[in-house]
A protein has these predicted regions:
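Interdomain hinge/linker elements that couple catalytic modules in large macromolecular machines
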Residues: 138-316, 331
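A short beta-strand-to-loop transition that corresponds to the Sensor-1 phosphate-sensing loop
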Residues: 104-108, 114, 129-131, 387-390
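Short regulatory helix/loop adjacent to the ATP-binding pocket of P-loop NTPases
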Residues: 109-125, 138-142
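Conserved catalytic/switch belt of AAA+ P-loop NTPases
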Residues: 86-109, 116-117
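A cross-kingdom feature that marks ATP-driven nucleic-acid transaction machinery
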Residues: 1-29, 33-49, 71, 251-252, ...
């Protein structure tokens, strides 16, 4: 398989010229090592903490480890040898060289606190997700996403028209690099192996989860709640565990970057807002496998298709902003009357409200809900309805129907 250019490369190279250490986090198998090896020069040493001998040396004698594996260096799965962080700090303090040490880590559950305590001010931290639809298509947009009609029109000129069959092919296939272009049998075997080896092993190491049968049932339970508010009682029932255990297991999956929780919007001026997050899978292909959707067509025509489409759009937004120049805050809005807005994109104190609909011609009256923003001292920016329409269409001066392939 040919190398697929990752959108994170631009940001990584920029931070590499500024920080002495760069850490790229993300779930197992999303392409962290592949990307960094692609960017590394021939003089950069590579070592993985999956190697037992290298890991034992790193844990027992970090000084000797760096004498053996000299910087500039790429250390894979560094969370398995947290003993290295103190020595990395010493190396950074003794050198002015930027980009000296590259790290990857796939378990954020316990690692990040140690990293921030030890390497504050010395390390740049980035997150890589599985392949986005844009990356798979080789698309690069010249304009930042601001949801204005002009920006959407500029993006539309670079892409083919939205196609529901292609969208659900991507949703069903997912973005794991190793399943791109493989047949159905190999895809199923890949995800089965991914759960039984990587996921189960990491869940045991990080969260002490040892019951493989209940853990798989819990994963299936999570897949059944995709794009819905988290319900710990329902998750607990799916795996015959206590709700408190379900909360712990979900936190493990969030730390392993299998699950993404979209926080609810909070504002002191707007009363009685929900505080419960919504549940999404970082990779829709894994979610579809767990729910036994055997083909893209059955998923597209199935009862859960709208939920999967929402999951797809939310994660495309997450990926877009994870790799973008500016930072934003992504939330959703829901009040005690069940009035809900699927996504708030908050940037520079401006809120861009977005609804997500699988339809190619959703009801334009959906945007009336956005007036709730005006009840507080908030600035409402451009927004709209992300859907399966084939080109951007203005709804009013501030909102558009937005083709989902433009995000």
């Amino acid at each position: 398989m040919a190398y697929i250019t990752r959108e994170l490369e631009r940001k990584f190279l920029k931070l590499n010229d500024f920080f002495k250490v760069i850490l790229v986090t993300g779930a197992r198998q999303v392409g962290k090592t592949t990307m960094l090896k692609h960017l590394a020069g021939s003089d950069r040493t590579y070592v993985t903490m999956d190697n037992t001998m290298a890991r034992d040396l790193a844990q027992s004698d970090p000084v000797l480890f760096f004498q053996t594996y000299k910087p500039p260096i790429l250390i894979d799965e560094v969370q398995k040898a947290p003993e290295l962080f103190e020595q990395i700090k010493i190396i950074c303090d003794e050198s002015d060289e930027k980009g000296l040490i590259w790290l990857t880590g796939s378990q954020q559950y316990n690692m990040m606190k140690r990293v921030r305590e030890t390497l504050a001010g010395r390390i740049g931290i980035l997150e890589l997700y599985s392949l986005s639809a844009r990356e798979k298509a080789g698309l690069v947009f010249d304009t930042d996403l601001d949801f204005s009609f002009a920006t959407l029109q500029a993006r539309q000129r670079k892409v083919p028209k939205n196609d529901v069959i292609q969208v659900f092919q991507h949703i069903w296939e997912g973005g794991m690099p190793q399943v791109q272009g493989v047949d159905d049998e190999l895809r199923q075997e890949y995800f089965n192996s991914y759960i039984d080896t990587y996921l189960m092993r990491d869940a045991t190491e990080v969260g002490g989860i040892t019951d493989a049968v209940r853990f798989r049932k819990f994963l299936v339970g999570c897949a059944s709640l995709v794009s819905e508010q988290v319900n710990y009682s329902t998750l607990a029932e799916s795996a015959d565990i206590a709700p408190s255990t379900a909360k712990e297991w979900l936190n493990v999956l969030v730390g392993l970057r299998i699950i993404y929780l979209l926080a609810s919007y909070s504002n002191n001026e707007l009363k009685r807002l929900s505080k419960t997050p919504k549940l999404y899978f970082c990779d829709t292909g894994l979610c579809a496998y767990l729910s036994m959707w055997l083909t893209p067509d059955t998923l597209r025509s199935g009862a859960a298709s709208g939920h999967y489409y929402e999951n797809y759009v939310v994660m495309e937004l997450v990926k877009n902003y994870a790799y973008a120049k500016s930072k934003v805050n992504l939330t959703y809005f829901r009040d005690s009357n069940a009035k809900e807005i699927d996504v708030f994109v908050e940037e520079n104190n401006v809120i861009h409200p977005l609804e997500i609909k699988k339809s190619a011609a959703p009801d334009r009256r959906e945007i009336k809900k956005y007036s709730v923003i005006d009840k507080a001292s908030l600035i409402r920016g451009n927004g709209g309805i992300i859907c399966m329409c084939q080109e951007p269409i203005p709804i009013d001066a501030d909102n558009c129907f937005i083709p989902s392939n433009l995000i």
